[in-house]
Design a protein with these regions (language model features):
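Catalytic His-Asp charge-relay segment
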Residues: 259-263
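N-terminal beta1-alpha1 cap of cysteine-dependent amidohydrolase-like domains
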Residues: 2-251, 256-257, 267-336
């Protein structure tokens, strides 16, 4: 069992040999210069798109599972409200330590447009943040970004503004799939950044057990990377998965030169969503999900932006308590 082998390693070596664990868990004060042990992560809200069996009393929302997913690894969350102005985005961005694009439902393109025009109610705002992240990193600041499912697809749309970037796939109702990892995965930051042995154990779980929950009608074909050099220049494909019809799609990515990661699957659902029988909740499924959360939050600790407490308090997600809806999501945070 991977956990037992990890304990053996921990007994024969010091936890100081795993700096991401040692430095982030002992206390609230940084034990390394430049390490931020109070990260604040912005989550881009989604426009109010009605789902089957529930409607949202608000202009946008976040599924609460994403909030708890980040909080469990030691971060706090600030909503980046999709209906707010670019000036508000510019205010929040230098105060946050990382950004997450969630899964859900939203349009990438302006309806009926003959050429690809980013939808003003979602994709244009997301790609604005994407460009800010790239610019910050280009200027020498470490600024991480993560995209899940819809957010994963958005990462591709932002890198390659073409209709054909996102394809149709047979991924509903939700299902689980194993990963076929590429050679890039074995040397990727995401599977070596916490500890090499731990990352290898998680890769083994993901490639042999159905721990990755998928719920999608769209995705990115591996052939799209061959069709559009913008994508292959920006991202390394870490894994390939297959939909219900056997069609391959990209499962995980890591940017080549930026701290940007994405998954077509939903690691947060294993921990916090219980309304679909297909969601895996067994031990190793939880191990995988907690690994992903801990990895991303560990990366946000490398960003040293400071959100002054008097400004942070009214922005924190706690100001919008979760609402139990017992539908597609267990709970949501809604914003008026």
């Amino acid at each position: 069992m991977w956990f037992l082998s990890f304990l053996v390693v921990a007994q024969s070596t010091s936890l100081r040999d795993f700096p991401e664990f040692y430095n982030s868990e002992i206390n609230h004060k940084p034990v390394q210069a430049g390490l931020n042990n109070a990260p604040v992560i912005g989550i881009l809200t989604l426009p109010n798109v009605p789902y089957e069996n529930f409607t949202i009393n608000g202009t946008s929302y976040i599924a609460s599972s994403y909030v708890k997913y980040l909080e469990m690894a030691g971060a706090r969350v600030v909503p980046i409200r999709i209906d707010h102005s670019y000036a508000e985005f510019d205010y929040l961005f230098p105060r946050l330590n990382g950004i997450l694009f969630t899964g859900g439902s939203a349009n990438f393109w302006v309806n009926s447009s003959k050429v690809p025009i980013l939808s003003p109610d979602y994709a244009a705002k997301g790609c604005y943040l994407y460009d800010l992240v790239k610019k910050a990193n280009d200027q020498g600041q470490f600024y991480p970004l993560w995209g899940t499912c819809l957010g994963f697809e958005l990462l591709h749309v932002c890198a390659n503004n073409q209709f054909a970037t996102v394809g149709n796939f047979n991924g509903e109702p939700s299902y689980t799939q194993v990963h076929q990892f590429t050679s890039a995965a074995t040397v990727s930051k995401i599977f070596t950044g916490l500890s090499l042995q731990f990352g290898q154990q998680v890769m083994s779980i993901m490639s042999n057990q159905n721990v990755s929950l998928l719920s999608h009608t769209h995705g990115i074909s591996p052939s799209t990377y061959q069709q559009f050099p913008n994508l292959s220049e920006m991202y390394n494909i870490l894994s390939i998965m297959h939909d219900k019809s056997g069609s391959p799609f990209v499962g995980m990515i890591e940017a080549r030169n930026y701290p940007i990661w994405g998954t077509q699957f939903h690691p947060e659902k294993n921990l916090y969503e219980w309304n679909q029988n297909s969601i895996p909740h067994f031990y190793n499924a939880v191990v995988m999900s907690t690994y992903m959360s801990n990895f991303f939050v560990s990366q946000t600790r490398k960003n040293t932006n400071v959100f002054p407490q008097n400004e942070l308090t009214p922005q924190l997600i706690y100001n919008w308590p979760p609402i139990f809806i017992d539908s597609y999501f267990e709970t949501i945070n809604a914003f008026n």
